[in-house]
Amino acid sequence: MKEWTKEQWQEALKQEKLAAFYLYTPMCGTCAVATKMLTVVEELLPQLPIGKANLNYIEELAYEYEIESVPCLLVGREGNVTQKVYAFQSVLNLYEILKN
């Protein structure tokens, strides 16, 4: 998963196909587990654009999307965020969310 800027996320979000943006903070233990789960999903869905960003560096995004906590996975297409995932639960759950 590559680190994305806010601009890179907005560009990916404009596309017709699904894109995901993973928001984390480095001191978050749950984020470390979520990162590992998303890495597996990324291998299973190589065509899906998935980026990540340290929310500490793009705080304006937290306000813009009303992020309540980290980890948070923003999922969207065609300029719209269609889902915000906070409870990652399992690799299978993330796969089911992102395979569409």
Regions found by a protein language model. Give the residues of each.
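Chalcogenol-based redox active-site neighborhoods
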Residues: 64-65, 91
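Thiol-based oxidoreductase modules, predominantly thioredoxin-like and allied folds used
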Residues: 3-4, 23, 42, 46-60
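Short hydrophobic/charged patches on amphipathic alpha-helices used for structural packing
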Residues: 10, 59-62
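Structural micro-motif
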Residues: 65-74
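Non-catalytic, surface beta->alpha helical segment in thiol-disulfide oxidoreductase systems
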Residues: 74-100
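Local sequence-structure signature of Cys/Sec-based thiol-disulfide redox active-site neighborhoods
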Residues: 8-41
